[in-house]
Amino acid sequence: GIGISNTPQECGKELTQMYESNVNDVLISCGGGELMCEILPYVDFDRIKAAKPKWYLGYSDNTNFTFLQNTIADTASVYGPCAGAFAMKDWHQALVDTFDVLRGKGCKNNNGVVEKQVHGYDTWERESLKNEENPAPQYNLTEKKILRKYVGGDECDTEIAFEGRLVGGCMDCLVNLTGTSFDKVK
């Protein structure tokens, strides 16, 4: 694993140990990447499943853990901003909402199941303004969100409501997990 913080074996061991640790309540990834898939054989998912549940926050390559935390350990995770995003001077509402979820703010407990209503945002960032001189810029929100709904392969214009656990992540990571020993989706 050139390009990750240690060998895949050590990274898997470290993730397992930090997840089991009693000195933290949440694990927040420093960033995405392309190599988290290499550590999966070295993450002890039996120990993760047996540990006290805690939040794991990250996006992109972190899907390799957030998705498996959901499907193998039956524990919620947050597919969202990595640690560096919280350095921006004025937090976008998405960062405020993420931080609120991690703290349990606005959540309700329904017979032991913690629930939080979620929503999207009107715009999104195609190109970040992040560079060496500006390591923590505001989001560069240039694109309008457009949602299309399909039922049975046909686009529909009626309102659709649903509830339940929202599970997902980075599509190329999800595709690469399909059919592996980590694929526990039923």
Q: How does the language model describe each region?
A:
Residues G1-V23:
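ATP/NTP phosphate-donor binding region
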Residues D25-V26, W55:
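Short, Asp-centered acidic motifs that coordinate Mg2+ and/or phosphate
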Residues I28-Y42:
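N-terminal glycine-rich "phosphate-gripper" loop used for MgATP/nucleotide binding
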Residues G32-E34, N62-T63, D172:
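Short glycine-enriched loops at secondary-structure junctions
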Residues V43-L68, A76-G84:
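Short, acidic/small-residue loops that bind anionic groups at enzyme active sites
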Residues A76-D172:
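Conserved anion/nucleotide-ligand pocket segment
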Residues L166-K186:
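Oxyanion-binding "anion nests"
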